Each structure stands twice: as C-alpha cells, then as structure tokens.
Amino acid sequence: MTVATSLVADIGATNARFQCCAISDDPAVVPVLLGEPLVLSTTSYVAQSSLLTDVAAHFAALADTQFSSALFAVAGPVTLDGRAVEVVNTGLQVDANEAGQLLSTAVTLVNDFHAQAMAVPFAQRMQQLGGGPVLPLVKGVLGPGSGLGMARLSNRTAWPL
C-alpha cells in the first residue's frame, strides 16, 4: 500500500478552503486529514501566485510538505482543456500549469459542482424527497453559492451544467 500527500481545495468567490490529506492507493482506506484546514478570503487575492504562496507557507509545518498531487474544485467554468478557470464574480484566474509550477506537483481543476456530483455516491446519509422507489437514474445536484450551482450524475459520470 502506498500513501501520497495531496492538496485539495474548494475555491469559491468568497472563500478558498485548502486541506492537506494522506491518500492511499487502496480505495478501501479513507483519506486522513493532515494539519488544520486553511480558509482564505478569495477577494483578498488578485493573483493565484500570492494565494498559493500563503497556502504553501501554511502547510510547510507538516512533516511531508511535498504534494504528490493537487485537486482544486473551483466556482466557475473550467476551460475545455481543463487547465484554467476564472473564479466567478472575481478577477482571480486559476491556471493549472502555473499552480503546478508553484506547488511542484500536478494540479487538476474541476468545476466545484462537478466535484459535488462525484461525491454523491459516497454520501453516508441521504434522505429521499418524494415517494416511490429509488431508481438508478440520473441525479441532479443543486446548491447556492456565488450563483446557483448545478451538475448531473449518471453512472458515476458527472457533468457541470
């Protein structure tokens, strides 16, 4: 079993939340959170370089600060090549290539509601609304944020709407 240190983030128009975690290559092993999460005001940053410098400084106290990967769930439409996104209602540009250079690891960008939809099958507690049997059909994920976030999930494939 191999364990890697990863950086995950939820970057919205108001706040950016970062967490370092240990992730096993065994899918049965639950990721372990490392250190305290970091919450920063997105509006305090005009450049991702200063944002990620603060993130790296926060997690530098951990024993293993070399991230093996990073995943950023960002409020906004990700470009078709998956390498950039502008955070909605801000001027903050997130670029996976630049972020990867700053953090010395590969960075993956996804839409924040894409990430939410992908998490649905792993939810521990869910409550059905409405009657009838639960069918293995397309599921919708809706939620408030900087706007109304939406995604659909079918057969474990998520699509932001």
Regions found by a protein language model. Give the residues of each.
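Short coil/turn connectors at secondary-structure junctions
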Residues: 3-4, 104-105, 135-139
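Short glycine-rich, Thr/Ser-proximal phosphate-binding strand/loop in the N-terminal lobe
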Residues: 2-54
